[in-house]
Regions:
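Membrane-embedded transport module
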Residues: 4-171
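Active-site-proximal beta-strands of protease catalytic cores
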Residues: 1
Length: 171
C-alpha cells in the first residue's frame, strides 16, 4: 500500500496506491466491495428461485398430465426480459454502512450461504405449491378454456417472480 504523494519506488513496489492520500478510501472500497458481493448474492437468490420453480412446474405439470404449463417462448421471455431487469434492479441497490458491521468472510466460503439456501428452497416450494394448485384447478376446466387458463398460469408465474424480486432485494 502506498500513498499518491509517495516516491515512485514505493508506488512500483506496492499493490495499491491511494491517489488521494486518505485511508478513508480503503473503508469506502471495502464497503463498495461488500455491497457488490451482497447484490450478487441477492441476484443468485432471485435467479435460482425462478429457475427452480420454472423447471419444477414444467416437470410436475407433465406428471399431472397437463399441456406444457410454460412454453419455450414464455421461458425465453422470462429469462431475457424479467431476469435482465431484475439484474439491473438488484445490482443498483446502493451500498449501505450496515455491511461494515458484518464480520469479514473467508475467501473459501461458498457464495450461497445456508440462509440463502433456506430462502431459495422455502420460497421455491411455496411458489411451486401455488402453481401446482392452479394446475390441478386447470385440469378440472373444460378443454375449450385451457388456452386462457395457461395464460393465467403464466401471469401467476410472472407475478410470483415480481414478489420474488422484492423478496431477494431485502435479503
Amino acid at each position: 500500500l502506498s500513498m499518491g504523494t509517495g516516491t515512485s519506488v514505493a508506488k512500483e513496489a506496492s499493490d495499491i496506491t491511494l491517489l488521494d492520500d486518505s485511508f478513508n478510501s480503503i473503508a469506502t472500497a471495502v464497503m463498495w466491495g461488500r455491497s457488490l458481493y451482497k447484490n450478487i448474492q441477492r441476484f443468485i437468490v432471485f435467479q435460482l428461485t425462478i429457475n427452480l420453480v420454472a423447471l419444477s412446474s414444467v416437470l410436475l405439470g407433465a406428471i399431472f398430465g397437463t399441456e406444457l404449463p410454460l412454453t419455450v417462448t414464455q421461458m425465453l421471455w422470462v429469462n431475457l426480459i424479467m431476469d435482465t431487469f431484475a439484474a439491473m434492479a438488484l445490482a443498483s441497490i446502493p451500498p449501505s454502512m450496515d455491511v461494515m458491521k458484518e464480520k469479514p468472510r473467508k475467501a473459501s466460503d461458498f457464495i450461497i450461504t445456508p440462509s440463502m439456501l433456506k430462502n431459495i428452497v422455502g420460497v421455491g416450494v411455496a411458489f411451486l405449491a401455488l402453481l401446482m394448485g392452479f394446475i390441478i384447478y386447470m385440469n378440472n376446466m373444460p378443454t375449450d378454456v385451457l388456452p386462457m387458463a395457461l395464460t393465467q398460469f403464466f401471469t401467476l408465474f410472472v407475478m410470483l417472480q415480481f414478489w420474488n424480486m422484492f423478496n431477494a432485494s431485502v435479503f
